[in-house]
Amino acid sequence: MKLAVIGGDGIGPEVTAEALKVLNAVRDDIEVTDYDLGARRYLRNGELLADADLVSLREHDAILLGAIGAPGEVPPGVLERGLLLKMRFALDHHVNLRPSKLYPTATSPLANPGDIDFVVVREGTEGLYCGNGGTLREGTPHEIASEVSQNTRYGVERVVRDAFERAQNRKKHLTLVHKTNVLVNAGGLWQRTVNEIATEYPEVTVDYNHIDAATIYMVTDPSRYDVIVTDNLFGDILTDLAGAVTGGIGLAASGNIDATGVNPSMFEPVHGSAPDIAGQGIADPTAAILSAAMLLRHVGDESNAQRIEAAVTYDVAERPAGPVKTVEVGDRIVAALQR
């Protein structure tokens, strides 16, 4: 397997090193190419993501990302638009996949969280994040700023189909989250698409939540969810809330997926670069390791994906109270693989 690794900034290289340690413990055929992308490169020479980088990345089977960002050093939006979103659009990562599971001994802020185990399938290349907007009369009392939410039948249908496929292979329940009572045009497109595709999946039950109601249910009754499908902005908000109710983003993994398989998909922990703890060896690499498991599942290695997830579940349950070193977490999970 040809694997592109973008360690990135802050704790990114530290957690990806442990994810690679675990990957190499279950497979002996991984060829790694490291890429110097992120704030460090931008601050050094002003480069973000060159066309040559994209050409090279496309030659790999998958991409593992650590974290990108340098708060206070790089202005907001530079790395997001010039690197992360550019890569997402260029590699057609139209499915953003975020599993949310409450692991044993993980502490949820909810008094009675129940059995939380759902996935959010977020559309990744359209909506309000497509860059369709602008500003007029900037800096004047009459300034106008607009952001246009772009939703196409093609874009909506392919992510809805992906969500139905996942629901078919899970607990067979899908929830559309939107705001159809106000966003009647985009919401209507999403609702019609779900209704039409639902006829192809008679075993999957379907319901609908407004986004504001979904934020309530995710706190009061998160176990009601199996697969959530939603647009780019609503998915961005919901997945952070999902991370919070399952004990924090330290265990939150994600995938940015081209479901067609034409381009390599990218897998990453949800957390940021955390420069305040970088280099101290205390960052929790569990989310990066779970992202590696998602990566293996995507490339068809279900057996080893399940092995890693089982090892993580065992380690989280047995992990001692108090801080655990980054390297030690990786070593513990490798040891758990041998059980």
UniProtKB/Swiss-Prot annotation:
Keyword Membrane: no
Residues that hold NAD(+) according to the record: 272-284
Cellular location(s): Cytoplasm
GO MF term set: 3-isopropylmalate dehydrogenase activity; magnesium ion binding; NAD binding
EC number: 1.1.1.85
Cellular component annotations (GO), alphabetically ordered: cytoplasm
Catalytic reactions of this protein: (2R,3S)-3-isopropylmalate + NAD(+) = 4-methyl-2-oxopentanoate + CO2 + NADH
Residues where Mg(2+) binds: 212, 236, 240
Membrane spanning stretches: none
Classification via InterPro entries: ICDH/IPMDH, IsoCit/isopropylmalate_DH_CS, IsoPropMal-DH-like_dom, LeuB_actb
Record-marked site positions (Important for catalysis): 129, 179
UniProt keywords, alphabetically: Amino-acid biosynthesis, Branched-chain amino acid biosynthesis, Cytoplasm, Leucine biosynthesis, Magnesium, Manganese, Metal-binding, NAD, Oxidoreductase
Biological pathway: Amino-acid biosynthesis; L-leucine biosynthesis; L-leucine from 3-methyl-2-oxobutanoate: step 3/4
Keyword Manganese carried by entry: yes
Top class in the EC scheme: oxidoreductase
Secretion signal, residue range per the UniProt entry: none
Cited Gene3D superfamilies: Isopropylmalate Dehydrogenase
GO biological process terms, semicolon-separated: L-leucine biosynthetic process
Binding site for substrate: 88, 98, 122, 212
Cofactor binding description: Binds 1 Mg(2+) or Mn(2+) ion per subunit.
Assembly description: Homodimer.
Function: Catalyzes the oxidation of 3-carboxy-2-hydroxy-4-methylpentanoate (3-isopropylmalate) to 3-carboxy-4-methyl-2-oxopentanoate. The product decarboxylates to 4-methyl-2 oxopentanoate.
Family: Belongs to the isocitrate and isopropylmalate dehydrogenases family. LeuB type 2 subfamily.
The protein, known as: 3-isopropylmalate dehydrogenase
Organism: Corynebacterium diphtheriae (strain ATCC 700971 / NCTC 13129 / Biotype gravis)
